[in-house]
């Protein structure tokens, strides 16, 4: 699947939360929080169908949309893309960056240590 834009992520979050969902329901929800024009939202939906992120099913006079990929799959792909683009694929460089920028709290560090301990090979 191709990477999805920030705007497409907003559509995906609605679809993941309420799948299956009609196009008008997606428009109603996103228009309320983003102020986007309904045509813009329909364009984003079409792009996501083209990218294979959501599927459309004809239901009488309207289309019903549902996620073709899970949120976890998209997060994994976005994470890998981000790591590759910003840190040459190095998770160590990412964590080092957060430590150097003083972005990790003591609680964050403890949680990371627990995650590392539980996943030690």
Provide a role label for each language-model segment.
Residues 3-7, 59-77:
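Short, cationic-aromatic polyanion-contact patches
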Residues 9-14, 25:
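Pre-recognition alpha-helix immediately N-terminal to the DNA-recognition helix
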Residues 15-19:
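Short helix-to-turn junction characteristic of helix-turn-helix DNA-binding domains
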Residues 21-29:
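Short acidic, hydrophobic short linear motifs in intrinsically disordered regions
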Residues 28-36:
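Short helix-coil junctions and helix-kink-helix linkers
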Residues 42-46:
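Short, hydrophobic-biased segments on the C-terminal half of alpha helices
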Residues 52:
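Glycine-centered, phosphate/nucleic-acid-interacting loop/turn motifs that mediate DNA/RNA or nucleotide
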Residues 77-118:
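Amphipathic alpha-helical dimerization/coiled-coil segments
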């Amino acid at each position: 699947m191709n990477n999805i834009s920030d705007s497409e992520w907003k559509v995906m979050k609605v679809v993941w939360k309420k799948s299956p969902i009609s196009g008008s329901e997606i428009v109603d929800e996103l228009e309320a929080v983003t102020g986007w024009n309904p045509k813009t939202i329909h364009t984003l939906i079409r792009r996501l169908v083209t990218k294979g992120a959501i599927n459309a099913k004809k239901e009488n006079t309207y289309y019903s949309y549902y996620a073709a990929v899970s949120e976890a799959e998209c997060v994994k792909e976005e994470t890998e893309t981000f790591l590759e683009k910003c840190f040459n694929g190095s998770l160590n460089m990412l964590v080092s960056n957060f430590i150097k920028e003083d972005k990790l709290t003591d609680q964050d560090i403890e949680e990371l240590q627990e995650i590392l301990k539980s996943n030690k090979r």
